[in-house]
Every structure is written in structure tokens, then in C-alpha cells.
């Protein structure tokens, strides 16, 4: 997972 992947939540 990328660093910005968590921003999808």
C-alpha cells in the first residue's frame, strides 16, 4: 500500500 492509500478512507 502507498503512503496515500490510507487517505481513501
Swiss-Prot record:
Superkingdom of this protein's organism: Eukaryota
One Gene Ontology term from the biological process aspect of the record: neuropeptide signaling pathway
GO cellular component: extracellular region
Subcellular location: Secreted
Phenylalanine amide found at: 9
Keyword Acyltransferase (UniProt): no
This protein's UniProt keywords: Amidation, Neuropeptide, Secreted
Similarity annotation: Belongs to the FARP (FMRFamide related peptide) family.
Full protein name: CalliFMRFamide-6
Species whose genome carries this gene: Calliphora vomitoria
